[in-house]
């Protein structure tokens, strides 16, 4: 092989090695999400800091909300698939921390950890489970999906809700873009909220930033015997930190047990807000 051919050959080899290395790096996803038919139509997703889910039509009989459930993560490692597998195949509840994190945040029929808040006549309205889902974009660093709700009851009027949520690598906050349609002549305030549990702990309001912040102990509903004890024999699972930001919010306050950041809204407009959470036990690898 002459010198020129040798150089060309080496160039091709190095190029292939470089492409292989780039490919290996590119396929390491930092965000993820999917429809979860094996768990009553959940729609779950995660970024590097936390995992989330919203409830689907198969859960309607249990009166769920259009709120957001929160799963705590111990590291940036993706956990959604492993949590569901552990729960539904291995019989190991995700309400217990086996080292990767846990689900200890109760939503019920509330806005949960960053769900939509609609305020009309000083009353908070919470919707039910979604009717349809669509994945709009899925890459290792960006996940975008849309949920549609056919009947959000507000002050005796039925509205339709579409919410598009974006999770991006390196961003602790999810982006939510909401459009409400239907017929309602009264004033509406719309934005994001955090449900404050009975054991209301520490919260802060940054009115000028349109931001609310809340934290509480991470307590699972499993019995103490099922929990992982720390070295003091305590069932404490650390602290949960949650925040919502609605740009240009006109109200940042507590309403019906929710810490809210909402603004004036006209039907048909797109309203954008941000929500996120993390755990005191989260550590970057």
Where are these regions (language model features)?
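N-terminal secretory signal peptides that target proteins for export/translocation
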Residues: 1-6
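Acidic (Asp/Glu-rich), glycine- and aromatic
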Residues: 161, 172-205
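Solvent-exposed N-terminal domain segments of exported/luminal and surface proteins
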Residues: 26-124
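A recognition module on extended beta-rich or small alphabeta surfaces enriched in W/G with H and D/E
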Residues: 74-78, 205-251
């Amino acid at each position: 092989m002459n010198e020129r051919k040798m150089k060309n050959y080496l160039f091709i080899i190095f190029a292939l090695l470089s492409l292989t290395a780039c490919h290996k790096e590119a396929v390491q996803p930092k965000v993820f999400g999917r429809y979860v038919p094996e768990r009553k139509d959940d729609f779950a997703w995660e970024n590097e800091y936390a995992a989330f889910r919203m409830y689907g039509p198969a859960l309607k009989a249990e009166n769920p909300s259009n709120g957001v459930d929160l799963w705590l993560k111990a590291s940036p490692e993706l956990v959604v698939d492993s949590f569901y597998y552990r729960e539904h195949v291995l019989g190991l509840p995700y309400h217990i921390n086996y080292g990767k994190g846990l689900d200890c945040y109760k939503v019920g029929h509330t806005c949960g950890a960053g769900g939509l808040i609609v305020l009309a006549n000083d009353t908070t309205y919470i919707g039910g489970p979604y009717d349809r889902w669509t994945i709009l974009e899925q890459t290792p660093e960006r996940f975008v999906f849309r949920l549609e709700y056919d009947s959000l009851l507000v002050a005796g009027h039925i509205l339709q809700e579409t919410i598009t949520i974006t999770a991006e690598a390196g961003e602790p906050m999810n982006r939510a873009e909401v459009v409400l349609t239907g017929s309602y002549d009264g004033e509406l305030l719309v934005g994001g909220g955090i449900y404050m549990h009975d054991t209301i702990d520490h919260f802060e309001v940054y009115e000028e930033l349109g931001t609310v912040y809340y934290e509480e102990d991470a307590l699972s509903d499993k019995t103490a015997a099922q929990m992982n004890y720390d070295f003091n024999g305590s069932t404490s699972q650390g602290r949960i930190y949650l925040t919502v930001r609605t740009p240009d919010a006109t109200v940042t306050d507590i309403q019906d047990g929710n810490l809210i950041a909402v603004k004036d809204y006209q039907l048909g407009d797109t309203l954008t807000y941000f929500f996120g959470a993390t755990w005191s036990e989260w550590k970057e690898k």
